[in-house]
Amino acid sequence: MNEHTIYLGGGCFWGLQGYIRKISGVISTEVGYANGPTENPSYEDVCHDSGHVEALKVTYDADVLSLDHLIQYFLRAIDPFSVNKQGGDVGIQYRTGIYYTDTADKPIIESTLARAQSFEGKPFAIEVLPLSNYYAAEEYHQNYLDKNPNGYCHIPLGLSNEPLVDDNAYNKPSEEDLKALSPQEFEVTQNSATDAPFSHNLTDEFKPGLYVDITTGEPLFVSAHKFESHCGWPSFTKPIAKDVIKYYQDDSHGMNRIEVRSRIGNSHLGHVFEDGPNGSLRYCINGSALRFIPKDELKGTKYEYLIP
């Protein structure tokens, strides 16, 4: 076992601990107070602007879970642009940060954040600093959500069950990649065109398998979340993971819609609506933006870990 430790600030530490401790490769977690100006603060002190951050001490097996991947899991649980606020919690103690004790971690942290930030187009508000001090929080805070199953949590704990689609495993499409697309695939993904309804064979494709971005190969959707919407386009209730899709306001054609684009390729995919089955969403996706890989063809590929 290759034990390593990192400290994370991501809003209320109850929810962050409940989420991170479920990730494969995490050995142990502890909540506490970090990088403040005074020694041994109490929860009351921290809640009254002591300057400490509510932090999660994460000990993990680096042979199972890389620091890069751990940070990617962390990013999906926070708002990286928010300053001193996560969810409904406001205060300096709720600032986001990554605090290291091994200087070799700093370039890994910075590289991971820079890569993720490049997909967003604006800077993150996440501080990256050496750990200057850390004090374990009171016992009643440790594993709080285990002791209080209905307790407050600003993080959907189910996020830990979503597969991690490594943002370093796929590349933005080159000119040659784009030239390999059909004219319709190019128009849809690069110029936000729309397939004619019922025109693409993937609309009626319901075999088990994986749907990836046709420009990059990044996994986007799985067949388990696909449904017959009778709208004329492939429809899904959700993406394979929260972080593979980007959302943009779209007021074109006199309509008020939410456009969805792929994370790595920035491909136009379609739109998302609130009329999915049983109160879920409907991701209405152009078949020309997708490549379907049947389940029996995933074995032996880089997608094998996504086989349910």
Each model region followed by its residue ranges:
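Flexible coil/turn and secondary-structure edge motifs
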Residues: 1-308
